[in-house]
Amino acid sequence: MEKRMRGWLLLIAILLLAACSKEEKVEDDVHEPIEEEQEVVVEEEPVQGPTLYKAPFTGVLSEEESTRRAVLATINNHPLARPQSGIGDADIVYELAAEGNITRILALFQSELPEEIGPIRSARDYFVHISKGLDAFYVAHGYSPDAKQMLQNRFVDNINGMQYDGTLFNRSKERRAPHNSYITKDNVLAGMEKTNSSTELSVIPRFSFLESIEDAKIGDIASMLVVRYGTDPDFTSTYSYDAEKGTYNRMVKGIVTVDKSNEKPVELSNILIFETAHRTIDNVGRQSVDIESGGKGMLFHAGIEKEIEWENSGGILTPMENGVPAELVPGKTWIHIVSTHPGMGTSVTYTP
Protein backbone atom coordinates (compact mmCIF):
# COMPACT_ATOMS: atom_id res chain seq x y z
CA MET A 1 0.00 0.00 0.00
CA GLU A 2 2.72 2.35 1.04
CA LYS A 3 4.63 1.49 -2.11
CA ARG A 4 1.60 2.27 -4.28
CA MET A 5 1.13 5.59 -2.50
CA ARG A 6 4.70 6.58 -3.29
CA GLY A 7 4.10 5.75 -6.90
CA TRP A 8 1.06 8.01 -7.08
CA LEU A 9 2.93 10.83 -5.36
CA LEU A 10 5.79 10.47 -7.84
CA LEU A 11 3.36 10.58 -10.77
CA ILE A 12 1.63 13.70 -9.41
CA ALA A 13 5.00 15.40 -8.93
CA ILE A 14 6.02 14.64 -12.51
CA LEU A 15 2.72 16.01 -13.84
CA LEU A 16 3.02 19.21 -11.78
CA LEU A 17 6.58 19.74 -12.99
CA ALA A 18 5.52 19.31 -16.61
CA ALA A 19 2.65 21.77 -16.18
CA CYS A 20 4.93 24.40 -14.67
CA SER A 21 7.43 24.04 -17.52
CA LYS A 22 4.68 24.46 -20.10
CA GLU A 23 3.36 27.58 -18.35
CA GLU A 24 6.81 29.12 -18.27
CA LYS A 25 7.19 28.50 -22.00
CA VAL A 26 3.84 30.15 -22.71
CA GLU A 27 4.85 33.14 -20.58
CA ASP A 28 8.18 33.29 -22.38
CA ASP A 29 6.36 33.23 -25.72
CA VAL A 30 4.03 36.02 -24.61
CA HIS A 31 6.83 38.33 -23.54
CA GLU A 32 9.12 37.59 -26.46
CA PRO A 33 8.99 40.62 -28.89
CA ILE A 34 7.82 39.96 -32.42
CA GLU A 35 10.00 41.64 -34.99
CA GLU A 36 8.10 43.08 -37.97
CA GLU A 37 9.71 44.21 -41.22
CA GLN A 38 9.49 48.00 -41.60
CA GLU A 39 8.46 49.18 -45.07
CA VAL A 40 10.88 51.86 -46.27
CA VAL A 41 9.02 54.75 -47.95
CA VAL A 42 11.14 56.77 -50.37
CA GLU A 43 9.66 60.22 -51.01
CA GLU A 44 10.02 61.35 -54.59
CA GLU A 45 11.21 64.91 -55.06
CA PRO A 46 8.77 67.00 -57.10
CA VAL A 47 9.92 67.62 -60.65
CA GLN A 48 10.50 71.34 -61.10
CA GLY A 49 9.96 72.91 -64.48
CA PRO A 50 12.15 75.68 -65.86
CA THR A 51 11.89 79.17 -64.38
CA LEU A 52 9.65 81.31 -66.57
CA TYR A 53 9.96 85.07 -67.03
CA LYS A 54 7.17 87.40 -68.09
CA ALA A 55 7.99 89.85 -70.88
CA PRO A 56 7.25 93.36 -69.53
CA PHE A 57 5.37 94.71 -72.56
CA THR A 58 3.58 91.56 -73.75
CA GLY A 59 3.14 89.39 -70.67
CA VAL A 60 4.32 86.38 -72.67
CA LEU A 61 6.22 83.78 -70.62
CA SER A 62 9.69 82.67 -71.67
CA GLU A 63 12.54 80.60 -70.25
CA GLU A 64 14.91 83.46 -71.06
CA GLU A 65 14.68 86.78 -69.27
CA SER A 66 14.92 89.68 -71.69
CA THR A 67 16.83 92.59 -70.21
CA ARG A 68 17.35 94.37 -73.54
CA ARG A 69 16.53 98.07 -73.57
CA ALA A 70 13.42 98.91 -75.57
CA VAL A 71 13.77 100.58 -78.96
CA LEU A 72 11.06 102.94 -80.24
CA ALA A 73 11.04 103.69 -83.97
CA THR A 74 8.89 106.17 -85.89
CA ILE A 75 7.60 104.26 -88.93
CA ASN A 76 6.02 105.81 -92.00
CA ASN A 77 2.32 104.94 -92.38
CA HIS A 78 1.68 106.59 -95.73
CA PRO A 79 0.07 104.23 -98.29
CA LEU A 80 3.28 104.41 -100.38
CA ALA A 81 5.26 103.16 -97.37
CA ARG A 82 3.23 99.98 -96.91
CA PRO A 83 3.81 97.21 -96.11
CA GLN A 84 6.28 98.17 -93.41
CA SER A 85 9.22 96.09 -92.24
CA GLY A 86 9.59 94.89 -88.66
CA ILE A 87 6.13 95.76 -87.34
CA GLY A 88 5.25 92.10 -86.82
CA ASP A 89 7.94 91.93 -84.11
CA ALA A 90 6.77 95.03 -82.23
CA ASP A 91 5.50 94.43 -78.68
CA ILE A 92 3.35 97.56 -78.95
CA VAL A 93 2.39 99.74 -81.90
CA TYR A 94 1.13 103.27 -81.24
CA GLU A 95 -0.78 104.87 -84.11
CA LEU A 96 -1.42 108.59 -83.84
CA ALA A 97 -1.81 111.71 -85.92
CA ALA A 98 1.26 113.48 -87.30
CA GLU A 99 -0.23 115.97 -89.76
CA GLY A 100 -3.98 116.47 -89.84
CA ASN A 101 -5.48 112.99 -90.02
CA ILE A 102 -2.34 111.41 -91.50
CA THR A 103 -0.98 108.98 -88.95
CA ARG A 104 2.46 107.70 -88.03
CA ILE A 105 3.39 104.52 -86.23
CA LEU A 106 5.59 104.23 -83.17
CA ALA A 107 6.79 100.64 -82.98
CA LEU A 108 8.16 99.46 -79.63
CA PHE A 109 10.65 96.59 -79.76
CA GLN A 110 11.76 94.90 -76.55
CA SER A 111 11.05 91.16 -76.74
CA GLU A 112 12.52 91.03 -80.24
CA LEU A 113 14.54 93.39 -82.41
CA PRO A 114 13.91 92.68 -86.12
CA GLU A 115 16.63 92.50 -88.72
CA GLU A 116 15.21 95.55 -90.55
CA ILE A 117 12.87 98.37 -89.53
CA GLY A 118 11.20 100.91 -91.76
CA PRO A 119 10.49 103.03 -93.60
CA ILE A 120 11.67 105.36 -90.83
CA ARG A 121 10.00 108.78 -90.65
CA SER A 122 10.29 112.03 -88.75
CA ALA A 123 9.76 112.77 -85.06
CA ARG A 124 7.18 114.88 -83.25
CA ASP A 125 7.56 116.28 -79.75
CA TYR A 126 4.87 113.96 -78.33
CA PHE A 127 6.60 110.99 -79.97
CA VAL A 128 9.74 111.95 -78.07
CA HIS A 129 7.79 112.26 -74.80
CA ILE A 130 6.38 108.75 -75.29
CA SER A 131 9.91 107.45 -75.84
CA LYS A 132 11.10 109.28 -72.72
CA GLY A 133 8.43 107.64 -70.57
CA LEU A 134 9.42 104.20 -71.84
CA ASP A 135 13.15 104.95 -71.52
CA ALA A 136 13.43 103.63 -75.05
CA PHE A 137 16.27 104.28 -77.46
CA TYR A 138 14.54 106.45 -80.07
CA VAL A 139 14.99 106.06 -83.83
CA ALA A 140 13.63 108.59 -86.37
CA HIS A 141 14.54 110.25 -89.66
CA GLY A 142 13.74 113.94 -89.52
CA TYR A 143 11.87 116.03 -86.95
CA SER A 144 9.45 118.86 -86.34
CA PRO A 145 11.02 122.09 -84.94
CA ASP A 146 10.10 121.20 -81.33
CA ALA A 147 11.27 117.60 -81.69
CA LYS A 148 14.55 118.74 -83.28
CA GLN A 149 15.43 120.83 -80.24
CA MET A 150 14.56 117.99 -77.85
CA LEU A 151 16.60 115.41 -79.75
CA GLN A 152 19.63 117.62 -80.25
CA ASN A 153 19.58 118.44 -76.51
CA ARG A 154 19.59 114.68 -75.82
CA PHE A 155 16.21 114.72 -74.06
CA VAL A 156 16.24 111.01 -74.95
CA ASP A 157 18.97 108.73 -76.24
CA ASN A 158 18.48 108.67 -79.99
CA ILE A 159 19.83 108.47 -83.51
CA ASN A 160 18.33 110.33 -86.45
CA GLY A 161 18.62 109.84 -90.18
CA MET A 162 19.32 113.56 -90.62
CA GLN A 163 22.78 112.92 -89.15
CA TYR A 164 23.32 109.31 -90.28
CA ASP A 165 21.67 109.09 -93.71
CA GLY A 166 23.73 106.72 -95.83
CA THR A 167 25.64 105.33 -92.84
CA LEU A 168 23.35 103.92 -90.14
CA PHE A 169 20.27 104.59 -92.27
CA ASN A 170 20.02 103.19 -95.77
CA ARG A 171 17.78 104.07 -98.72
CA SER A 172 15.81 101.34 -100.45
CA LYS A 173 15.79 101.43 -104.25
CA GLU A 174 12.27 99.97 -104.25
CA ARG A 175 10.68 103.20 -103.05
CA ARG A 176 11.13 106.94 -103.34
CA ALA A 177 11.91 109.39 -100.54
CA PRO A 178 10.54 110.01 -97.98
CA HIS A 179 9.21 106.45 -98.00
CA ASN A 180 12.50 104.58 -98.34
CA SER A 181 14.66 105.09 -95.23
CA TYR A 182 15.49 101.86 -93.37
CA ILE A 183 17.70 100.79 -90.49
CA THR A 184 18.99 97.32 -89.65
CA LYS A 185 19.23 95.66 -86.25
CA ASP A 186 23.03 95.85 -86.39
CA ASN A 187 22.91 99.59 -87.10
CA VAL A 188 20.47 100.22 -84.23
CA LEU A 189 22.95 98.52 -81.90
CA ALA A 190 25.83 100.42 -83.52
CA GLY A 191 23.91 103.65 -82.96
CA MET A 192 23.48 102.84 -79.27
CA GLU A 193 27.21 102.27 -78.98
CA LYS A 194 28.07 105.39 -80.99
CA THR A 195 25.92 107.56 -78.69
CA ASN A 196 27.13 105.84 -75.50
CA SER A 197 23.56 104.80 -74.72
CA SER A 198 22.67 102.10 -72.22
CA THR A 199 21.55 98.80 -73.69
CA GLU A 200 19.86 97.57 -70.49
CA LEU A 201 16.14 97.65 -69.70
CA SER A 202 15.45 100.08 -66.85
CA VAL A 203 11.70 100.84 -66.95
CA ILE A 204 8.99 98.25 -66.29
CA PRO A 205 5.44 99.33 -67.23
CA ARG A 206 2.47 98.92 -64.88
CA PHE A 207 0.76 96.63 -67.36
CA SER A 208 -1.33 93.76 -66.01
CA PHE A 209 -1.87 90.51 -67.90
CA LEU A 210 -4.47 87.76 -67.59
CA GLU A 211 -3.47 84.18 -66.81
CA SER A 212 -5.89 82.82 -69.42
CA ILE A 213 -7.71 84.24 -72.43
CA GLU A 214 -10.91 82.73 -70.98
CA ASP A 215 -10.70 85.28 -68.15
CA ALA A 216 -11.03 88.07 -70.72
CA LYS A 217 -14.46 87.10 -71.97
CA ILE A 218 -16.45 89.58 -69.89
CA GLY A 219 -17.91 92.50 -71.84
CA ASP A 220 -19.78 93.28 -75.04
CA ILE A 221 -19.23 90.90 -77.95
CA ALA A 222 -17.13 92.61 -80.62
CA SER A 223 -15.73 90.37 -83.33
CA MET A 224 -15.04 93.27 -85.71
CA LEU A 225 -14.11 96.91 -85.14
CA VAL A 226 -13.25 99.92 -87.27
CA VAL A 227 -11.05 102.86 -86.20
CA ARG A 228 -11.14 106.04 -88.29
CA TYR A 229 -8.93 109.12 -88.48
CA GLY A 230 -11.22 111.53 -90.28
CA THR A 231 -12.85 110.24 -93.45
CA ASP A 232 -9.76 109.12 -95.38
CA PRO A 233 -10.01 105.35 -96.01
CA ASP A 234 -6.19 105.19 -96.22
CA PHE A 235 -6.13 105.79 -92.46
CA THR A 236 -9.10 103.66 -91.47
CA SER A 237 -8.23 100.37 -89.76
CA THR A 238 -10.51 97.34 -89.66
CA TYR A 239 -9.85 94.52 -87.19
CA SER A 240 -11.41 91.06 -87.28
CA TYR A 241 -11.15 88.55 -84.45
CA ASP A 242 -9.96 85.01 -85.11
CA ALA A 243 -11.50 82.95 -82.29
CA GLU A 244 -9.36 79.92 -83.11
CA LYS A 245 -6.09 81.83 -82.72
CA GLY A 246 -7.36 84.30 -80.12
CA THR A 247 -5.90 87.23 -82.08
CA TYR A 248 -6.97 90.06 -84.38
CA ASN A 249 -5.95 90.67 -87.98
CA ARG A 250 -5.73 94.25 -89.22
CA MET A 251 -6.76 95.55 -92.64
CA VAL A 252 -6.71 98.91 -94.42
CA LYS A 253 -8.87 99.28 -97.53
CA GLY A 254 -9.34 95.52 -97.53
CA ILE A 255 -5.60 94.79 -97.54
CA VAL A 256 -4.31 92.71 -94.63
CA THR A 257 -1.51 94.38 -92.65
CA VAL A 258 1.60 92.23 -93.03
CA ASP A 259 5.25 92.53 -92.13
CA LYS A 260 7.17 93.11 -95.36
CA SER A 261 10.12 91.15 -93.99
CA ASN A 262 8.25 87.85 -94.04
CA GLU A 263 4.83 88.62 -95.59
CA LYS A 264 3.12 87.27 -92.46
CA PRO A 265 -0.01 89.02 -91.11
CA VAL A 266 0.43 91.09 -87.98
CA GLU A 267 -1.45 89.26 -85.21
CA LEU A 268 -2.64 91.26 -82.21
CA SER A 269 -3.96 90.18 -78.81
CA ASN A 270 -5.22 93.61 -77.72
CA ILE A 271 -6.55 96.71 -79.46
CA LEU A 272 -6.62 99.84 -77.29
CA ILE A 273 -8.25 103.18 -78.06
CA PHE A 274 -7.16 106.25 -76.08
CA GLU A 275 -9.12 109.47 -76.56
CA THR A 276 -7.36 112.78 -75.95
CA ALA A 277 -7.29 116.42 -77.04
CA HIS A 278 -5.65 117.33 -80.38
CA ARG A 279 -4.88 120.81 -81.70
CA THR A 280 -3.51 121.92 -85.08
CA ILE A 281 -0.49 124.18 -84.52
CA ASP A 282 0.71 125.23 -88.00
CA ASN A 283 -0.33 125.50 -91.63
CA VAL A 284 1.29 122.13 -92.43
CA GLY A 285 -1.25 120.47 -90.15
CA ARG A 286 1.15 119.42 -87.40
CA GLN A 287 -0.62 118.48 -84.19
CA SER A 288 -0.30 119.10 -80.50
CA VAL A 289 -1.48 115.92 -78.78
CA ASP A 290 -2.19 115.79 -75.04
CA ILE A 291 -0.56 112.62 -73.72
CA GLU A 292 -0.51 113.81 -70.10
CA SER A 293 -4.11 114.25 -68.95
CA GLY A 294 -5.53 110.77 -69.49
CA GLY A 295 -9.13 110.19 -70.47
CA LYS A 296 -11.63 107.73 -71.86
CA GLY A 297 -10.63 104.53 -73.58
CA MET A 298 -11.78 101.26 -75.07
CA LEU A 299 -10.23 97.80 -74.85
CA PHE A 300 -10.83 95.03 -77.37
CA HIS A 301 -9.54 91.53 -76.70
CA ALA A 302 -10.83 87.94 -76.93
CA GLY A 303 -13.67 89.19 -79.14
CA ILE A 304 -14.92 91.42 -76.31
CA GLU A 305 -15.15 95.22 -75.86
CA LYS A 306 -14.75 97.03 -72.53
CA GLU A 307 -15.07 100.68 -71.59
CA ILE A 308 -11.89 101.74 -69.77
CA GLU A 309 -9.83 104.83 -69.01
CA TRP A 310 -6.20 105.62 -69.64
CA GLU A 311 -3.64 107.57 -67.69
CA ASN A 312 -0.06 108.70 -67.99
CA SER A 313 1.61 106.57 -65.32
CA GLY A 314 5.19 107.69 -64.85
CA GLY A 315 5.36 108.69 -68.51
CA ILE A 316 3.81 105.45 -69.83
CA LEU A 317 0.32 105.54 -71.34
CA THR A 318 -1.47 102.89 -69.30
CA PRO A 319 -4.96 101.36 -69.72
CA MET A 320 -6.93 101.53 -66.46
CA GLU A 321 -10.09 99.87 -65.20
CA ASN A 322 -11.70 100.81 -61.88
CA GLY A 323 -8.55 102.57 -60.73
CA VAL A 324 -6.10 99.75 -61.47
CA PRO A 325 -4.28 98.69 -64.65
CA ALA A 326 -6.69 96.95 -67.02
CA GLU A 327 -5.86 93.28 -67.57
CA LEU A 328 -4.63 92.51 -71.07
CA VAL A 329 -4.39 89.23 -72.94
CA PRO A 330 -0.70 88.25 -73.23
CA GLY A 331 0.62 89.13 -76.67
CA LYS A 332 1.07 92.12 -78.95
CA THR A 333 -0.97 95.33 -78.64
CA TRP A 334 -1.97 98.08 -81.10
CA ILE A 335 -2.84 101.42 -79.49
CA HIS A 336 -4.86 104.03 -81.39
CA ILE A 337 -4.71 107.56 -80.02
CA VAL A 338 -7.72 109.48 -81.35
CA SER A 339 -9.00 113.02 -80.93
CA THR A 340 -11.76 114.03 -78.53
CA HIS A 341 -13.28 115.78 -81.56
CA PRO A 342 -15.18 113.99 -82.98
CA GLY A 343 -14.47 111.47 -80.19
CA MET A 344 -14.55 107.69 -79.92
CA GLY A 345 -18.29 107.58 -80.58
CA THR A 346 -17.57 108.60 -84.18
CA SER A 347 -14.01 107.33 -84.59
CA VAL A 348 -14.69 103.78 -83.39
CA THR A 349 -17.47 101.37 -84.31
CA TYR A 350 -17.78 97.66 -83.64
CA THR A 351 -20.12 94.78 -84.40
CA PRO A 352 -20.73 91.42 -82.65
Spans of model-derived segments:
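A surface/extracellular/periplasmic glyco- and lipid-processing/surface-interacting theme
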Residues: D28-P46, Y53-R68, L72-A90, E99-P352
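C-terminal motif of bacterial Sec signal peptides marking the signal peptidase cleavage site
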Residues: L15-A19
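Bacterial N-terminal signal peptides that target proteins for export
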Residues: M1-L9
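Bacterial signal peptide processing site
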Residues: S21-E24
